[in-house]
Amino acid sequence: KDYASDLWINTQARAVAAKTVGIKALTFNFETIQGKIYVAGITARPDLLDEMTVALKNIKGVNEIVNYVIIREKL
């Protein structure tokens, strides 16, 4: 049950990222373990990361978001 639930949460996380940050969502990786979403990637837009994190927390079954995203300087 946990695996199926985590897989569904992961699928929803990718959809939320695509809706929130658009094509740049491809720069993020998601892994869900027991309702905890691990997010990794690189972005120059911390505002979009914050918006995406809020949206991820609203996914049913999500207990926690663990952020491993690196914020890089805009060139």
How would you describe each model-predicted region?
Residues 1-75:
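N-terminal targeting leaders
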